[in-house]
Amino acid sequence: MGERVVPIVPDEARTFGMEGMFKQIGIYSSEGQLYEPEDADQVMWYKESETGVMLEEGITEAGSFAAWTALATSYSNHDLTMIPFYVFYSMFGFQRIHDLAWAAGDAQAKGFLIGATSGRTTLNGEGLQHQDGHSHILSATIPNCRSYDPAFGYELAVIIEHGLKEMYENKKNNFYYLTVTNERYIQPPKPKSKSIDKNIIRGMHRVIEVKEPKIRLLGSGAILNECFKASEILNDYGIDNEVWSVTSFNMLRKDGMETENENIKNPLSKDKKSFVAKSFSENDIPTVASTDYMRAYSEQIRPYMSSPYYTLGTDGFGRSDSREKLREFFEIDANNIVMTSAYALFKEGTLDKKEMQKIYKKCDLKRNKNSPWNE
């Protein structure tokens, strides 16, 4: 299968840590290397050759995506199945080439789009031009695009393996959009649950489980770590909680729509439950979701929630600052998750006024701060 895989980048290969491919597989050039590269004295020098595999297209997202589309439709146009991986700054994906992506979907393209350095607060220090907080919302407009925002390496591996099987073995006419980040954090081993792979693909799985939780936290991508921090703070206040890793709010929405549509068409049959409803049926408790994307991303599952549901997101323009400061500014960090949880429990009557105020004071709520989307 390896000879069919084609990595594609515009001009950010070193940013993505892909320079090791220069020497290992080479950069394709129809005329070979016609110059001595500036980094010729380095180990990972810029090596072009007629037998190169990697496509390094320069600063042209449209050209790079055109190459991806040619490879992604090669199975049909040339009876030669190829497996393209186009890796790019996630902000410069659908934001710039959405019409081409729509056309690729219409042409039944098959392959992987990797939105690297994703997340409005995770790619810190590069300002509003680079900080993506809405690519998953844009990807949701393309019917056969399957998009995921995994937090851990094992989730990414499961999704790619599933995608390969779906597209090339089961002949499904889909393509996949996956967001990954440049933030370093601990990668846990894959849980041993029999349903783990299936749940990752369906859109979410539980990563912290307790016997009688009072609040449920949902997180995706790098922001799942903020949920872990919030979980520990809540534990300090005696508030038991469970945490879920949401790999795709888009897929959860598709499942919810499909379930609802089937119920409407079969009014005399017992209504089926969406994956969200079934997963949360054990505990009818408030839920707080926090992501590195606009609130509209996590809002997609609200129709399928039976208990109070609160969403935190990165509505507004990006900023240049540290991740910690950006997450505080956009109100998606651990403290804001904890405060929202305290509010939900107070409104429900589970948390008394004194304890709620104590938590708010500890989390240093800035009452006079403008909402980030109004800044």
Report residues per predicted region.
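Thiamine diphosphate
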Residues: 1-188, 195-196, 250, 256-266, ...
